[in-house]
Design a protein with these regions (language model features):
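Glycoside hydrolase catalytic-domain context in secreted enzymes
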Residues: 1-183
């Protein structure tokens, strides 16, 4: 047969109604969105969320999480702002690392194992800098802007967070690029 890799956008926030319908098995756990998790200032809490979500994803037959969203939320007008860990590079880096470690690290294997869920970090090279807060999923949001020349800052959560995990998997397994023209 043809191998399948079922994936999902985040589904644990209060808006967890897009694809998952609770059946006789009960419901999936509900957590704050990413910005709410960031408000804890706790990589340990975010990693614990990742471990719980990993188990639930595997139970649902999901092998890849289309997350974490490692974008620096530099423009609060962006409608995806609440899906970020906020605007502060160090905090976003630490929480991105914790999130990916929680999803990917199978404790029985000390790294990759049957319980692992791939973390697809997004949106390279940083989607939170859309011109005027506009989103790149639409034509009017095709340009990323980096006021003050802070392009390099937007890459920090990827280069120092998602690609330098502390768990046995070492780095996020996948990267989702963004649709912007980044300059």
């Amino acid at each position: 047969g043809i191998p399948a890799n079922n994936s999902s956008d985040p589904r644990h926030s209060a808006f967890a109604d897009a694809e998952f319908s609770p059946g006789s098995d009960g419901s999936i756990s509900l957590w704050s969105n990413m910005l709410g998790l960031a408000a804890t200032f706790s990589p340990e809490t975010v990693e614990e969320f990742g471990r719980i979500a990993r188990e639930e994803y595997r139970a649902l037959g999901l092998a890849t999480a289309l997350s974490p969203q490692a974008d620096l939320g530099t423009d609060p007008r962006w409608y995806r702002y609440s899906s970020t860990f906020g605007p502060e590079p160090r905090l976003v880096t630490d929480l991105t690392r914790a999130y990916a470690d929680g999803f990917q690290t199978d404790p029985t294997a000390g790294g990759w194992g049957n319980g692992s869920v791939n973390a697809m970090v997004k949106h390279w090279p940083g989607g939170g800098s859309g011109e005027g807060g506009r989103d790149a999923h639409y034509g009017n949001g095709k340009f990323a802007v980096y006021p003050g020349g802070c392009y390099e800052q937007h890459k920090i959560p990827f280069l120092e967070g998602a690609f330098k995990l502390t768990g046995g998997t070492e780095k996020a397994s996948a990267v989702m690029p963004y649709y912007t023209i980044s300059y």
